[in-house]
Amino acid sequence: MTEPTAKVCHYTDVPAATFGDDAPGVSIRWVIDETKDGAPTYALRVIEVAPGGHTPDHTHPFEHENFVIEGKGRVQIDGEWHDVGVGDVVFVPPSAQHTYVNAGDVPFKFLCGIPVSRLMP
């Protein structure tokens, strides 16, 4: 693991990556992580879902903490849909089935905190 160092930057200084074919219109920026920044506990990501885009319906053994910073979306957690917008927070428990969908005509953007790999089950 990289030694932890302070970091201050604009999120757009971090390159965006795509999620892949199963997540049309979705990009991710790992703005704080264990590999580049030495974050010992949590990684922070900015996820952007373009109009008409969505993440795959998926599950994993770790939680998500989300904070919506732009646009409107719909989040499905274990079969229940929730409408979300700027300022809303979302907690996805470990092993919950979930997906994110852009519900508007501008990007749906949110922060997503997850544990670093060494703390994942």
Residue ranges of model-derived segments:
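A short hydrophobic beta-strand segment most commonly corresponding to one strand
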Residues: 46, 91, 106-121
